[in-house]
Amino acid sequence: MGRLSNLRAVDPVLTQLAIGYSNAEYIADFLFPMAMVRKEAGRIPKHTKQSFKLIATERALRAKSNRLVPDDRNFIDFAMEEHDLSVPMDYREEDESDDLDVEAGNTYLATEGIALRREKIAADLAFNPANYGVPNKVTLGAGDKWTDPASNPIEVIREGREAIRRGIAKRPNSLALGATSFEALSEHPKMLERLTYAQLGVLTPQLLAAILKLDRVIIGDAISVSDDEATNSDIWGDSALLFYARPAGPTGKRSVYEPNYGYTVGKKKIEVDKYVEEGGKVKNVRATAIFKTLLVGADAGYLISDTNA
């Protein structure tokens, strides 16, 4: 890592604007909530299954106490990455427009670019089958895809729920769906049949969560466009992920020492500053965030790939 020789003056007004920008389509925070740490590199503990071992705890009269020797701790190394994006404005553009409005718009572009990048990183990590063991993933074949009315998505989800319970002794409380996966699931005859029995209306994410006995169902609606803006692509594709997310504590803050499916370790939240170049004729608004997205508990997830035909 190079020397951080130049300190940046943060613009408080634009930083507050950046904090206020949030896209309802982004779901990375649900899977990989932000946990702030002080250093850009370090290690976080990987929790073992020692507490699941069945141990003889009976003790005879005057016998020695039973002893449990803790397993050696395993750690996950991390090194954060800096993400930054600047948007330029020529002084002539500034003269022809409302300065604050242009700066606010440029702040949106810069912060949105970083947020979309984080969403893509999260999707690639969560929906990559290589990140899961054999018991914690399935790729649906032709007859099992949710776009096939004869398939049984409820059974697939039930198997995933049981796989997680066997792995971590907790049932999953969340389901993340790509946008097209949600459409297929919400229109599936078996789901609509459950809806009819319950005498409910349209199958919303909230009703779907109730039917599947989950705390929440989240939909990844974010898209990206090609450089020529000719092609739109779903960030989250056509996959689904059952997972256990540890609820945040009373303060809402997260700690990497708490077991969880995943975390985003961050040194600081997004900040915005301004700098000039080209002899003072171009003013840049720049957004900066330092973080690393980590899948720390793959056993707490169950990936269902290729849900749609």
What residue spans do the PLM features occupy?
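Alpha-helical scaffold segments that mediate packing/assembly in large oligomeric complexes
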Residues: 91-171, 179-192, 308-309
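Generic recognition of long tandem-repeat/solenoid scaffolds
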Residues: 44-47, 69, 242-244, 285-287
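Assembly/oligomerization interface modules of large self-assembling protein complexes
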Residues: 20-85
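Extended oligomerization regions of viral-like shell subunits
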Residues: 170-261
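Protruding loop/beta-arch "assembly-hinge" segments enriched in small, turn-prone residues
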Residues: 1-37, 268-309
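Intrinsically disordered, low-complexity linear regions
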Residues: 2-25, 46, 133-134, 138-141, ...
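Phosphate/anion-contacting hairpin/loop surfaces
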Residues: 174, 249-252, 265-269, 286-288
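Short, hydrophobic/proline-enriched secondary-structure or compact coil segments at domain edges
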Residues: 14-23, 27, 31-32, 44, ...
